C-alpha cells in the first residue's frame, strides 16, 4: 500500500515555492535602496563627491534630478522601519533622530550625461518606505522646524 503525502507536507512544499520569491523580491528592493541611498563613510561631500557617486552607483544613464545618500549604518537605517521610526503618511516611516545626509541635485539643463551635481549636506530627519521591516524607498529628508 503506497502512502500519500500528508496535508502538512504539502503545505510545507507550497511554502518552499511561495516564500523564496517574496524574500528575493524584498532583498532586491533593499539592495536597490542601498545602491541608491547608502554610503556609510563618504570621502568628501562636495560636488565632486556627488558626481563620482552618481556614476559609481550607475544612477546617470539619464541625469537623476535629485538623489540623497545617507551616511550611517545599515542597522540604524533599517531601525527606522521599527522602533526608531514613526508612521508618516501612507506606508512611510519618519526617523526619530537626524541622519547625516548628502543630497545631490542635478545642475545641468540636459537630462543626458555627463551629469553635473550640486551637493548639499546636513543632518536631517529622513522618510523612507519599508516592506517587511526593510527599507526599500527613500522619500525625502528635511530639517525640523
Curated annotation (Swiss-Prot):
Expressed (at protein level) in macrophages. The active site is at residues 37, 137. CDD domains: RNase_A_canonical. PROSITE patterns: RNASE_PANCREATIC. The record marks 64 as: Critical for catalytic activity. The keyword Nucleotide-binding does not apply. Keywords: Cytoplasmic vesicle, Disulfide bond, DNA-binding, Endonuclease, Hydrolase, Metal-binding, Nuclease, Nucleus, Secreted, Signal, Zinc. It is found in: Cytoplasmic vesicle, Secretory vesicle lumen; Secreted; Nucleus, Nucleolus. Its EC number is 3.1.27.-. GO terms for molecular function: DNA binding; endonuclease activity; metal ion binding; RNA nuclease activity. One of its GO terms (cellular component) is nucleolus. Disulfide bonds join 50-104, 63-115, 81-130. Zn(2+) binds at residues 65, 106, 137. Divalent metal ions, such as Cu2+ and Zn2+, may inhibit the ribonucleolytic activity. InterPro entries: RNaseA, RNaseA-like_dom_sf, RNaseA_AS, RNaseA_domain. This is Angiogenin-2. It comes from Mus musculus.
Amino acid at each position: 500500500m503506497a502512502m500519500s503525502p500528508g496535508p502538512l507536507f504539502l503545505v510545507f512544499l507550497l511554502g518552499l515555492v511561495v516564500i523564496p520569491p517574496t524574500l528575493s523580491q524584498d532583498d532586491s528592493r533593499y539592495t536597490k535602496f542601498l545602491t541608491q541611498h547608502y554610503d556609510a563613510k563618504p570621502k568628501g561631500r562636495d560636488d565632486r563627491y556627488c558626481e563620482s557617486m552618481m556614476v559609481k552607483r550607475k544612477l546617470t544613464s539619464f541625469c537623476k534630478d535629485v538623489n540623497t545618500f545617507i551616511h550611517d549604518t545599515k542597522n540604524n537605517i533599517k531601525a527606522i522601519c521599527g522602533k526608531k521610526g514613526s508612521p508618516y503618511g501612507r506606508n512611510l516611516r519618519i526617523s526619530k533622530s537626524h541622519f547625516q545626509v548628502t543630497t545631490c541635485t542635478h545642475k545641468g539643463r540636459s537630462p543626458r550625461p555627463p551629469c553635473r551635481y550640486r551637493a548639499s549636506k546636513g543632518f536631517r530627519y529622513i522618510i523612507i518606505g519599508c516592506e517587511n521591516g526593510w527599507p526599500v524607498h527613500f522619500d525625502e529628508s528635511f530639517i525640523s522646524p
